[in-house]
Amino acid sequence: MNTSAEGQSPTSPQSVAILGAGAWGSTLAMLAQGQGHRVRVWNRRKGLDLAEVLQGSQILISAVSMAGVRPVVEAVRQVGIPPQAILVSATKGLDPLQLLTPTQIWGATFPEQPLVVLSGPNLSAEIRQGLPAAAVVASRDPWAAVQVQYALSSERFRLYTSSDPLGVELGGTLKNVIAIAVGVCDGLQLGANARAALVTRGLAEMIRVGSKLGARAETFNGLSGLGDLLATCHSRLSRNYRVGYGLGQGQPLSQILAEIEGTAEGVYTAPVVVEIAAQHGIQVPITQEVHLLLQGQTTPTAALTRLMERQLTSE
């Protein structure tokens, strides 16, 4: 994009539309309002007028669940958006129909819009409490990434830019499955050694998948990969970790999901990653065991045994 044509300073007040009023969408709205921006939040269930919310928006942030991405994209397509509006995806998941990331779905419908991925170790409850956090905004359009960086950064929320949107997006998505595995480990009370092994080998698994799909391996060592993985695997605030912990304690998946507010995206990401891995010949043993466990086709103990008894190899 021609940046000079925008005439918009990164520090100028912006008009920000946020799609999704869940925990993350509400947190992003709080961050944007704290920086003096004009913020409008749209929630399908509240019957708000989408056209009114989008009118004049310079930054449009999608913070809906993965299941809501396609319906929201279609709703936005019907209404239309300002031609220079920056589309930001803050969703972590994979589409089970076409095996696409959220940004790929947005890009297919709005190929002319600048696209940005926002991801990182961002437990929304901590951010709402005013605790410090950092994240990454990634785009093939450097100007768009900088616009979003300055729009949301504050003394308590630091944003870095990246030119690898696919890597940033996949890091935030793939780690949800590994977090379930780590939760199972803790639910079984297997100790710090086992947890460290799962996190480390889980990161290697994420890198294998991401690299095969075209992301840069080094991206996964940053905030959106390792950073998000560590936060998600070491906090009871993480829905995915809580799913795994409950399974490790012997609770039925249906009961666990009923007790969790919001969506544990890793539950729905696991089968998609298994399918992608099968298509591309990628080894994802941890994800495979998580998938079997979620489907009720194995037990936590049996899954652990299979992982430990895999053929010995180099790291």
UniProtKB/Swiss-Prot annotation:
- Please give the Gene3D superfamilies that the UniProt record associates with this protein: N-(1-d-carboxylethyl)-l-norvaline Dehydrogenase, domain 2 (1.10.1040.10), NAD(P)-binding Rossmann-like Domain (3.40.50.720)
Keywords, in A-Z order: Cytoplasm, Lipid biosynthesis, Lipid metabolism, NAD, NADP, Nucleotide-binding, Oxidoreductase, Phospholipid biosynthesis, Phospholipid metabolism
Mind naming one GO cellular-component term on file for this protein? cytosol
Molecular function (GO) terms for this protein are: glycerol-3-phosphate dehydrogenase [NAD(P)+] activity; NAD binding
Q: Where does NADPH bind?
A: W24, R44, R45, K92, S124, R239, E265
Q: Which reaction does it catalyse?
A: sn-glycerol 3-phosphate + NAD(+) = dihydroxyacetone phosphate + NADH + H(+); sn-glycerol 3-phosphate + NADP(+) = dihydroxyacetone phosphate + NADPH + H(+)
Name-wise, this protein is: Glycerol-3-phosphate dehydrogenase [NAD(P)+]
Read off the lineage from the record.
Bacteria, Bacillati, Cyanobacteriota, Cyanophyceae, Synechococcales
Question: Active-site positions, per UniProt?
Answer: K175 (proton acceptor)
